[in-house]
């Protein structure tokens, strides 16, 4: 009788398999926790309120840099390309792109390269980082190609080559910064949402400075 009662009590107190499975599914994985710690360590938010402010600030900066890149391309390439002699520039060695199409390819390649490099670093994926590095070098080659043609082939004068490469540098830099801000904002939003839904905290503990008063000081020697 005692053994039967003990077995019934153990069966009643034992958790149901479905409840255990649900608890395991709801628990954050070590991969997600490590990724959140990597993001927090890189961006260094002090608390959850600062995470919210950083999301808003980076989203705003991403939009501002993105529209600045578009306006610069519109004025310097789309509208002013003919006056700067873009139609006389030779086609690119890679893809046989004209300068107008090159001004669209460079920001596209830069955008994808920035996303791959950022996600490869945060996730610790070598293939993603490898692909991002390949695209980054390709974008750099397309940007400096006019200067290289001037120095090696001699089919461009100095002013034309510097003007062509300079515009591509500005476009690539603006789109890189805009994409980086956008990805950081999305990652911070993911960290904030995961912390709120999973009730975990990956933020570093704040250490208040220790203020020593005069009472703690040793008396002077007489």
Label the model's feature ranges.
Residues 60-64, 83-109, 128-141, 161-171:
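Transmembrane alpha-helix entry/boundary detector in multi-pass membrane proteins
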Residues 24-76:
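Cytosolic juxtamembrane helix and N-cap/initiation of the first transmembrane helix
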Residues 200-222:
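Low-complexity, proline/glycine- and charge-rich juxtamembrane/linker segments of membrane proteins
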Residues 120-145, 202-205, 209-210:
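Cytoplasmic juxtamembrane regions at transmembrane-helix boundaries
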Residues 108-113, 147, 213-218:
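Long, compositionally biased low-complexity segments enriched in polar/charged residues
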Residues 1-47, 219-222:
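N-terminal, intrinsically disordered, low-complexity segments
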Residues 56-77, 145-208:
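Alpha-helical membrane-associated segments of multi-pass integral membrane proteins
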Residues 104-125:
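Canonical alpha-helical transmembrane segments
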